[in-house]
Amino acid sequence: MNEQQNQTRSFVQAKLSEFSKRVSQGYHKPVRSFFKDMLMGICGTGEPSLHNIAKFIQDNTSTKKTSERLYCNIRRANLAEDIEDFLTDLIRPQVTDDTLFIVDDSDIAKPYAKSMEGCGKVHNGSESKSTNGYLLMNIFALLTKQDGYSLLPASSILFAPSIEPDSAKQVLQDKIVNQQIAFRNNGTYVFDRGYDDRKLIGFMVDNGVSFVIRGMGLRAIKEGIVEKNFKEEVDKMKFKYKLPGLRKNEEFHCATRRIGVRTDDHPSKKASSVEISLVVVRKYRDGSRKGKDFYLLCDFDDPHMPEKEVIARAIDTYRRRWAVEEVHR
């Protein structure tokens, strides 16, 4: 290991020790040691496996005894809630209206698990195959700094693969309500296509939560008591706004309009609905159209926001989410 690697290692260890002290403040010494061991172990092994963390920790005891100690501490009542409360307190002073809350699905693979509660088949995206494990819903806070951005965890929710979709949606909605109370209704939530869901859209609008969802382009557009074909309505839109693209010689041709989204499961004349903005982006490079239309469903709790501002804010919001994903890949 060269000098630069040693310096980096020492720097990371010092930062982790400092963070561990803050997280475990108020706990007894054994619990404080547990927090530090877990943080160092996860960073050192690259995975949240207690057995591998136990092997990584050098505490002059057997791997078996170290594993038992870690298992004992991780079963402590309200441990997850205490950690999340700490993260909320850590983030709260830094949250502004420009903050993005990035909602991202993931998974934890447990390929050798045979009797773990709730464990089931999940798609392991990193290996592109099905394996045993759990579903994970993460919410990250992307905070604007003077010298760039800071990405901090705001919440992490573990699900059994067998959970009913409506139950998972309710857990997410409860989490958003709690965060909006804690963060004084600041920030914008950003979702990928898997969250293009009428119930979620209705919930966000009804609670005055700003959001951007990448649309799938499949839902009908509600106008009065009539529901119209999405693609046909998009073809009628005027692409009169032009913005710089993400690459050289690239330009976005954009259009937006307010649309109605039915929030009831089944269409009817009395079906409930909410109104949001639809932003459609067409990519042009060197004057030629490239790719398919890109749809963003959004609402910034300001019905009087000018169209160009809606477009620019929606694109910039999703661009920042996309940039974070690229870095993690």
For every predicted segment, state its role.
Residues 10, 25, 52, 62, ...:
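Noncatalytic, typically N-terminal accessory segments of nucleic acid-processing enzymes
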Residues 56-69:
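Short, basic interhelical loop/turn and adjoining N-cap
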Residues 45-55:
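Short, charged amphipathic recognition helices of the HTH superfamily
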Residues 1-44, 86, 110, 114, ...:
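Single, function-defining residue in the core of a domain
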Residues 39, 67-146, 260-265:
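Active-site-proximal, Lys/Arg-enriched surface segment
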Residues 48, 65, 322:
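Conserved active-site and cofactor/substrate-binding residues in soluble primary-metabolism enzymes
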